[in-house]
UniProtKB/Swiss-Prot annotation:
The gene is surE. This is 5'/3'-nucleotidase SurE. It is found in: Cytoplasm. Belongs to the SurE nucleotidase family. Its main location: cytoplasm. The keyword Ribosomal protein does not apply. Keywords: Cytoplasm, Hydrolase, Metal-binding, Nucleotide-binding.
Length: 253
């Protein structure tokens, strides 16, 4: 199995390095990751400037100023030859639960892999300690995929409790929960008296029902949520069509 491995925490982050070491026990792994932390970069792609890369002695590649999406795009189309069998993103430091997936560079890297035609997995740890647990779970999933491919055309968003492996209760297939909107901004003043602003933490849980990713991880289970690239709200099609007719928009053209 040939794996393109990326993340949004940066090429030297403990999550990606722990996972790369574990995956190399049974797979051919090429790391292509940002040269710095790009958390929250979502699906951003660098279009107005060129990208440089740096290859380390172990073969890992850092994309200078690159986003997670840049890294996967370059990895698939230029840097990994032969091309990968699957794109894996992670292990993220901290969870990507509920509407975190909208902002997540970790999920975006997997999404870019799927957009380019490859199976894709995004892996996050609900904390900052037991990366070995998340690595073991990821290896088990990938071994399963090598035995029997999952033909859903979906991204698997995997969130792992920050626990020793022996304390993991199992795996649940879940849906995304949701958070209350984040609204905290943290102002600071620089030495020259100018105001600086920091984006605050994510909002509290809003929908954390029993079938959500939030609930699974809180209860000690690995959460696996299938995601897809198509953002169309198909169930709203007729509602929007009827609304356009009722307000008369478009009838003059």
């Amino acid at each position: 199995m040939r794996i393109l491995l990326s993340n949004d925490d940066g090429v030297h982050a403990p999550g990606i390095q722990t996972l790369a070491k574990a995956l190399r026990e049974f797979a051919d792994v090429q790391v292509v990751a940002p040269d710095r932390n790009r958390s929250g970069a979502s699906n951003s792609l660098t279009l107005e400037s060129s990208l440089r890369t740096f290859t380390f002695d172990n073969g890992d590649i850092a994309v200078q100023m690159g986003t997670p999406t840049d890294c996967v795009y370059l990895g698939v189309n230029a840097l990994m030859r032969p091309r990968p069998d699957i794109v894996v993103s992670g292990i993220n430091a901290g969870p990507n639960l509920g509407d975190d997936v909208i902002y997540s560079g970790t999920v975006a890297a997997a999404m870019e892999g799927r957009h380019l035609g490859f199976p894709a997995l995004a892996v996050s740890l609900n904390g900052y300690q037991h990366y070995d647990t998340a690595a073991a779970v990821t290896c088990a999933l990938l071994r399963g995929l090598s035995r029997e491919p999952l033909r859903t055309g979906r991204i698997l968003n995997v969130n792992v409790p920050d626990l020793p492996l022996a304390q993991i209760k199992g795996i649940r297939v879940t849906r995304c929960g949701s958070r209350h909107p984040a609204d905290k901004v943290i102002p600071q003043e620089d030495p020259r008296g100018n105001t600086l602003y920091w984006i605050g933490p994510p909002g509290d849980k809003y929908d954390a029902g029993p079938d959500t990713d939030f609930a699974a991880v809180d209860e000690g289970y690995v959460s696996v949520t299938p995601l897809h690239v198509d953002l169309t709200a198909h169930s709203a099609h007729d509602v929007v069509s009827d609304w356009l007719d009722s307000v008369g928009v478009g009838t003059q053209w």
